[in-house]
Structure formats: structure tokens, C-alpha cells
Design a protein with these regions (language model features):
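Basic, flexible linker segments flanking DNA-binding modules
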Residues: 1-51
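Glycine-centered loop/turn motifs
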Residues: 49, 57, 165-166
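Short conserved beta-strand segments at catalytic cores or DNA/RNA-binding microdomains
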Residues: 51, 64-84
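Active-site beta-loop-alpha junctions of metal-dependent nucleic acid enzymes
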Residues: 65-69, 85-109
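Acidic/histidine-rich, metal-coordinating catalytic segments
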Residues: 110-123
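Charged alpha-helix within mobile-element recombinases
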Residues: 120, 130-137, 141-205
Length: 205
């Protein structure tokens, strides 16, 4: 059990919240840098167990962009709304896929089933990610962020912690872990006012 929950236990830092808003990533506008992705599997081909959120282990992901072309990946589990944040040093597909594979690889097998992403160029090497993690990637329709509703909602919550125009290169992974812990310890109406952390613990028991 300890090995399953080690990624939940990170130190919590203080003074994280701010009322300012986060800059929207470039991937959400018409000049997103999206392009044709080889061997892309459409979100429309996702099985029913993903659509109805019945089975844990299916994730939604996105790349947030800050000042000076800095980036953070957000990962939200659809069943529990559990959130992970990953600092990304560069936006090229090799760097992004490697960072995501490393983070997903920390999870127990039952939490590694699928990932839904938009059609940004950073996921061109999605097959490499799948080989490394055994996690299938599904791609949203162009400019359709609502198809990753849990992820979009979480990105909105993150605006309370990360100021608009922040240079993410100045933010440590430990700081991101603390923000994620705050989100995961917040009761959610959609979860019957349980927390994502509690829901995930129940899955792992």
C-alpha cells in the first residue's frame, strides 16, 4: 500500500493562493501550433468505461503556457478528479512525452489506462508515450477544450494559485506538488463533497 500512495505524500507549502488569473495556453486559440498527428486515435473512439467515468485510471491532460515560453502539464483523473502537475522544461514533443511518461509511470497499474489530450504538436510522439507506459492516448477534436471538461475545470482552479503571466521556470516541482495537494484535498460537489485524495485512496484499497 505504501508504494501505491507515495506519490500522494508531498510537503505542503504556505501562501500559495492568489486572486490573479493565469494566462491561457496558446493551444487554446486558432494559432495553437496544432498539426497533423500520425496514427492519432480520436476521442470518438473511446470506450464506454471512459465516457461514463466508471473505471479509474483514465486521465485528461493539457499544457499550460506561462511567460517566456514556459510550461506546466496538468493531468486530471476522470473518476476521482485527482490532479498531478508536471513542470516541463521545453515544449518539444520529446521533452513533453518523456516528462509525462515519467509521471504516469509512478502510478500503480490500475491507474494507468488512457490519456486524452488536444491536438497540440507536443504530443506528436504519442506512440512513444504509449510504448513506455502502456497508456492509450485519445485526441480531442480541434479547438474543443470542453471535451476535456475535468481538465478545463482544474485549469480554472489553478488560476487561484499561479498568477497570470508567471514565468514557470521559477516554479519548482515541489511547489507544483503542493498546489496539487491543495486541489486534491478540496471537497468537490461533483464527488458528493468528498475530496479527490479520498476518492483515490478508496480506489487503491
Amino acid at each position: 500500500m505504501a508504494s501505491h500512495t507515495r506519490f500522494l505524500t508531498v510537503p505542503l507549502t504556505a501562501q500559495l493562493r492568489t486572486a490573479r488569473r493565469m494566462r491561457r495556453p496558446k493551444s487554446h486559440n486558432a494559432k495553437s501550433g496544432q498539426g497533423h498527428i500520425l496514427d492519432m486515435v480520436s476521442i470518438r473512439e473511446r470506450p464506454a468505461e471512459i465516457e461514463d467515468r466508471a473505471v479509474p485510471g483514465h486521465w485528461e491532460g493539457d499544457l499550460l503556457t506561462g511567460a517566456n515560453d514556459t510550461h506546466i502539464a496538468t493531468l486530471v483523473e476522470r473518476n476521482t478528479r485527482f490532479t498531478m502537475l508536471v513542470k516541463i522544461s521545453r515544449k518539444d514533443t520529446t521533452t513533453v512525452v518523456a516528462a509525462l511518461a515519467k509521471q504516469i509511470g509512478k502510478l500503480p497499474e490500475e491507474l494507468r489506462r488512457s490519456l486524452t489530450w488536444d491536438q497540440g504538436k507536443e504530443m506528436h510522439a504519442h506512440k512513444r508515450f504509449t510504448v513506455a507506459t502502456n497508456v492509450q492516448v485519445y485526441f480531442c477534436d480541434p479547438r474543443s477544450p470542453w471535451q476535456r471538461g475535468s481538465n478545463e475545470n482544474t485549469n480554472g482552479l489553478l488560476r487561484q494559485y499561479l498568477p497570470r503571466g508567471a514565468d514557470f521556470s521559477r516554479i519548482s516541482q515541489s511547489y507544483l506538488n503542493a498546489i496539487a495537494m491543495r486541489l486534491n484535498q478540496r471537497p468537490r460537489k461533483t464527488l458528493g463533497f468528498e475530496t479527490p485524495a479520498d476518492k483515490l485512496q478508496a480506489v487503491l484499497h
